[in-house]
């Protein structure tokens, strides 16, 4: 994966035949696997015994990983299109990739021909063994999007029925089969040469004598006299002939005979081309074992011979047993007898069956067979009575040859099971015996089995074939890691993990040597020749094989120039011969640097090598594709020539350039390179010295995202009062608008709703919670009435006096009476009338006018002896001398008198006078105190002291809990005022400060909306403006200075807005810049997305910082502005003092608020359900506002499509191939394309030359589709999990948008087969991944997270999904419904349950963990670490870089350079893994000087705690990013 979704531009400055004959080559009997088994698909290996052969093979992993692109493959493909070709290439060089390219080309031509009404033709891929039928069929299915079927004799009698073949030809366009199957098919005229369009021969060196390959050519191909009806021939082999010590002339003659037979010409590549493409062979080593003992008879052998030596058919068994005694040891010879008689018995049974059907056979009689069967049973019983025991690792039981093999295998399997080994033997019994031996002596990490040819025992053909296939499958999966194999494994079996091949029995031919060596496919692999000491025959066999291989290489090297591909030396010679005056050149005006045709190749290579790559495996060289074309060169009399397209890696700023037509390929390549360099210079990717400008250009663009930091803070003004209160102020209102406010779940005491009267209609604000003493939430609900209350001067005065009395009695604030300065009025309402208030013609009827008049006329009263005691209950008591002493009276306390001591439970804090209850009730200062003036017989009341708590928007804080725990106290009434405010109304007024604070926050948020001209609800607007901690933007981190009670902060909306901003800017550059590529898209989008750009809008133009809410509720700032304070706290402060508030805001916070507002605009108008363009108009408007760029001028969604101009490639007529693709895609996803060429573009990889179809690659679409899919994923998470924070959302978005998931979806849909690409690495990587992920899905039994555990897929698979989404979006005229439908059908089912462990932990994986375990566990090394430092580079045109290093025993072995330490370390880990994985522990110790002593061996001895500690130590050693 791009690690956990991270992508960073990377600086990769350094990168980091005939076969031996044996029993396996017997003539094979017809197979009896049924048609039903072949056709039916079954699930998983739990029932392997019942799986069909085809289904088993369909899950095999047969790819070889190729680490570089190969230009010779393209040249060979282009040649094979033009003429019949025999490709002579070494094993592991990607011959099958060339065949796939050729098949794709031929099938596209076939589709066009069929569309024209031509007769249907088939392509045949011929192989030499049943195994290879299914293997190659699976390979082709991954690379072709037409039907491919593998056929072998396993289909039995149905192959002799015309209906079978007609059905196969109807549903497939490619048949993979053994040559004998094709011969039989053609013999019965089910197929003819004229009905074929392509014949491919795999391992073509078999085409000789009477081999089926030869019969196809001699009996059928040659007999088609009309050459125009013959199919194209493409043959592949590592060696066209087996040299066998013959002279070079004989080899040339044999090669000519092969060419004649196949009607083809040999083409090969030079060693320099292989070296240039990093084709490496395994390291070869010779293991010499001491001379074997002469053949001898063991004691058991002697006993068997004494008893049964007279039986003539047993004689060969005695000979074989003596041979095993010599080659394998005593134990193997004795063990041989245990199954030798069983084998013989099976053979006799077969003969008896044959006698039943063949009475003319006279060699045997039934009586003779019966007699021999009796002796066989007797001998079997005789052997079984002996206890052979287990072999010991000693010369007594084992031969020196087996002991040497054990030594080498132990080197690889001493610690882990990771190695994969194939041991080649000559005889079937040798493989079986070695398997039995190593079951005992191989150790806990060696898991072995045998791989032998299909035998011919009666009734067992199917089982034997099935067993062979399952064994290979287990070997690929790692359940087996060592195979003892006969020559059946020599040809064609691709096992990428195989890193050790042992020739236990030496090859007998050069082809056997070359083919078996080719099985070692791992990059760190070894090929081991086992030779007997002083055995001249062995030495000569080794020398002859190498000599014959050299003869063959010399033969290839001596081929004429037109048969050799990619000869670098020849190209250099041609370039030197060029004369600059004949071709254009460029001289830079500033520096005088000169670019010529010749130098352009090296300039371009240097540019690519130094260009940052996000993918370590991406090809790091230009690819040149040369096509024949009519020449414009006047010097070419034949007017035939070549045109070249140069293709750069997909991360480069320009991908493709087509040169001019020239008569020579080399000049055509120079032309393309020259034009590319000119374009790079024009766009400033090359500087005046023709060096990359990357160190100046890319960092500036990339750092746009990092241009601001939260650590950089500014001191900004903060608005604390909304403009709403200022409307019509300084006037006396003639009417007021009423808003009723209530708490839906009550308060701590019974309460009365209140009415707020305002000069203008109050906006309808959302409900919000306040928190009661017991932490229960109760929602404040308001309803605004639009019918005003008409006022008289008397009524207005009454309302004003009442409101000011609230401030005086409850909050101890005395304001000057000034109606014109009032912001609002607070009045009680009659609760039972609230429900019908909207139906009232006069809203004044809801007001509690009795209470209002009572308070107006008599704000309070005092106790006197004449007062009734009933009037003292449930009253609000105010201490006129102390603003902190307010009480609710609960009941009389008749058991107490004023002179009694203050009860012990009454809190003493801040009370100086505690002599008695009366003394406690008087709070006058000492000088004015005289408690004797109070009546000494007045009653004592039990009251509830009203706490100082004001911030009801937050839960009760710890410091408040102590006060709230003990509110009961006792007072005498006479020293206090008894307010005429009703107690329930007072209870409501005590939460008024929190209500006013939140109301004002909403109103300020609406002010911000007015400034921005955005229609957003108060709730969302306030959420977008709320920053409740110093580090709100650091999701998942512990909050610093967190302020409770502020409501939801901007984090979630910012997360949503960031996503929509990406969609909108991606879409705008997509439609406005039709000629630019993905690189330029990224730059333009980055400049709009960057925080610095958002800052300029928010700070410079709209001053959005004023409206950001960074402070929680303040006891000082909620009071109304404008009124003159006469008494109370803050008297000395002017209004300007407390209104001029500032706050510190980080630059990133301001930018985040911008994105949050985009998210708010999106959420406000996105209705859900069926999408309409209007849903997103307001969000688009917000993006235009904040992006503030000419690259985004759209104000509503429909503006995007209005700005889109369909490119010519989209509207051009579709070919039959493109229509066929659209039809196939529609079968998987229900959408019919209006423009099939647009769909085709979504499947074209950047490596595919543009000139082949004149359709651009998917890069532009992938750029857009990435953001569209992001939107779909985030909408799903955002609305399904409304309470999850951005950290959780980000972590759970990570698996959704990962390449790993989208790659798995691509395979599940089968769309990997439709991708058109021209890079060998992708063919093998896709094949590897397809087999692995399909196997994981089968094993998962329906679990949707099966894809998490598989390897990282090629990024192109995920790109295809993103490009397809963009394609349907564009084709549908920018209708997001089609994106949503794709998400709902194919993606959403994977994420219905986000609590799966695989998803919860997805984002926490890291490559360094793999490296840590590899070094600590597999190799047992404790002296290693990672480090990073800043360093200068030696590359021209480069500045400083970060070097990340992997040190082993104080020596740096692996490193990576980049402009980010974080990513450089990841790449350094990848580089180390690439070199270390597959090495056996002994070789690691040898290469890297490791002498660490580890406690215990093997996986059982691993201390996981120690390993985990090592991981932590490693991460600690890495340190922070530089």
Swiss-Prot record:
Cofactor(s) in the UniProt record: Mg(2+); Mn(2+)
Database matches in SUPFAM superfamilies: P-loop containing nucleoside triphosphate hydrolases, RNase III domain-like
Segments forming domain DRBM: 1409-1478
EC number: 3.1.26.-, 3.6.4.-
SMART domains in alphabetical order: DEXDc (SM00487), HELICc (SM00490), RIBOc (SM00535)
Region described as Disordered: 1-37
Ranges spanned by the short sequence motif DEAH box, renumbered to the chain: 202-205
Domain Helicase C-terminal: 408-576
Alphabetical keyword list: Antiviral defense, Antiviral protein, ATP-binding, Helicase, Hydrolase, Magnesium, Manganese, Metal-binding, Nucleotide-binding, Repeat, RNA-binding, Zinc
Binding annotation for Mg(2+): 1262, 1359, 1362
InterPro entries: Dicer_dimer_sf (IPR038248), Dicer_dimerisation_dom (IPR005034), DSRM_2 (IPR056755), Helicase/UvrB_N (IPR006935), Helicase_ATP-bd (IPR014001), Helicase_C-like (IPR001650), P-loop_NTPase (IPR027417), PAZ_dom (IPR003100)
Annotated positions binding ATP: 89-96
Pfam families assigned to the protein according to its UniProt record, in alphabetical order: Dicer_dimer, DSRM_2, Helicase_C, ResIII, Ribonuclease_3
UniProt keyword RNA-binding present: yes
GO biological process per UniProt: defense response to virus; regulation of defense response to virus; siRNA processing
GO MF annotations in UniProt: ATP binding; DNA binding; helicase activity; metal ion binding; ribonuclease III activity; RNA binding
Domain Dicer dsRNA-binding fold: 600-700
Ranges of Acidic residues composition bias in the record: 1-12
Binding of Zn(2+), residues: 1421, 1449, 1490, 1492
Catalytic EC class: hydrolase
GO cellular component: cytoplasm; nucleus
Function per UniProt: Dicer-like endonuclease involved in cleaving double-stranded RNA in the RNA interference (RNAi) pathway. Produces 21 to 25 bp dsRNAs (siRNAs) which target the selective destruction of homologous RNAs leading to sequence-specific suppression of gene expression, called post-transcriptional gene silencing (PTGS). Part of a broad host defense response against viral infection and transposons.
Family stated for the protein in its record: Belongs to the helicase family. Dicer subfamily.
Name the UniProt record assigns to this protein: Dicer-like protein 1
Organism: Phaeosphaeria nodorum (strain SN15 / ATCC MYA-4574 / FGSC 10173)
